[in-house]
């Protein structure tokens, strides 16, 4: 199977730990915070933490969904931590971040699916860090646009929602998520005037034509920024890698995406949703 093939050289990284990495880890740990960097086993954690940046994950570290590509734990989440928004905001201040990225687990167990907690977190970050720009990577909120509006009204600078993969593969790997619902969420964000962003993985068995189709679908609803990265199987229990896409093909996807009309396309094997996110605010 493809997932048992040795990873190509371009996917080998050196995590390395400099003083900034150690300090970032200390701040995250001391505030009892969760990051998608560690829970998602992000290949860029060494680089990002070494620069003093991290993607904070709110709502706890247990997700109500069980997507076949994701390493985040699935189960019954704990009650929300009312102090979490302040802890995240304080950590951002300690890290002296110019740009902060926040994501969350899915909280389908909550009446508002966690949208109120999202809005509180954004406002608290703004209160303690008025000069910091904010990007949020949100769940689909089951397509309930009144909940998406709670996030929009908190006024982050960029709102991202990941399509994850092409239409054909989406039902095979996404738990309780729907391709068209995700498009509707992104379109709703774009129509609000907020800068919109989405991300996909490749290497799941999609074709280049399917990648172009999802680009067209995203552009049709107003998406401005696209990230494309290689899917890496977290464990043997997860969906297998079908292909290791070459750096040349990633470069081709970037060229195609820009020609089609995206304002920014990040496309490379190790690209993840928040990779170089600080550049997307410009």
Curated annotation (Swiss-Prot):
<feature type="binding site">
    <location>
        <position position="37"/>
    </location>
    <ligand>
        <name>[4Fe-4S] cluster 1</name>
    </ligand>
</feature>
<feature type="binding site">
    <location>
        <position position="67"/>
    </location>
    <ligand>
        <name>[4Fe-4S] cluster 2</name>
    </ligand>
</feature>
<comment type="pathway">
    <text>Protein modification; protein lipoylation via endogenous pathway; protein N(6)-(lipoyl)lysine from octanoyl-[acyl-carrier-protein]: step 2/2.</text>
</comment>
<dbReference type="InterPro" id="IPR003698">
    <property type="entry name" value="Lipoyl_synth"/>
</dbReference>
<protein>
    <recommendedName>
        <fullName>Lipoyl synthase</fullName>
        <ecNumber>2.8.1.8</ecNumber>
    </recommendedName>
</protein>
<dbReference type="GO" id="GO:0005737">
    <property type="term" value="C:cytoplasm"/>
</dbReference>
<keyword id="KW-0949">S-adenosyl-L-methionine</keyword>
<feature type="domain" description="Radical SAM core">
    <location>
        <begin position="49"/>
        <end position="263"/>
    </location>
</feature>
<dbReference type="GO" id="GO:0046872">
    <property type="term" value="F:metal ion binding"/>
</dbReference>
<feature type="binding site">
    <location>
        <position position="42"/>
    </location>
    <ligand>
        <name>[4Fe-4S] cluster 1</name>
    </ligand>
</feature>
<dbReference type="GO" id="GO:0051539">
    <property type="term" value="F:4 iron, 4 sulfur cluster binding"/>
</dbReference>
<dbReference type="GO" id="GO:0016992">
    <property type="term" value="F:lipoate synthase activity"/>
</dbReference>
<dbReference type="InterPro" id="IPR007197">
    <property type="entry name" value="rSAM"/>
</dbReference>
<keyword id="KW-0004">4Fe-4S</keyword>
<keyword id="KW-0808">Transferase</keyword>
<dbReference type="Pfam" id="PF04055">
    <property type="entry name" value="Radical_SAM"/>
</dbReference>
<keyword id="KW-0408">Iron</keyword>
<feature type="binding site">
    <location>
        <position position="70"/>
    </location>
    <ligand>
        <name>[4Fe-4S] cluster 2</name>
    </ligand>
</feature>
<feature type="binding site">
    <location>
        <position position="274"/>
    </location>
    <ligand>
        <name>[4Fe-4S] cluster 1</name>
    </ligand>
</feature>
<dbReference type="InterPro" id="IPR006638">
    <property type="entry name" value="Elp3/MiaA/NifB-like_rSAM"/>
</dbReference>
<keyword id="KW-0479">Metal-binding</keyword>
<feature type="binding site">
    <location>
        <position position="48"/>
    </location>
    <ligand>
        <name>[4Fe-4S] cluster 1</name>
    </ligand>
</feature>
<keyword id="KW-0411">Iron-sulfur</keyword>
<feature type="binding site">
    <location>
        <position position="63"/>
    </location>
    <ligand>
        <name>[4Fe-4S] cluster 2</name>
    </ligand>
</feature>
<keyword id="KW-0963">Cytoplasm</keyword>
<comment type="similarity">
    <text>Belongs to the radical SAM superfamily. Lipoyl synthase family.</text>
</comment>
<dbReference type="InterPro" id="IPR013785">
    <property type="entry name" value="Aldolase_TIM"/>
</dbReference>
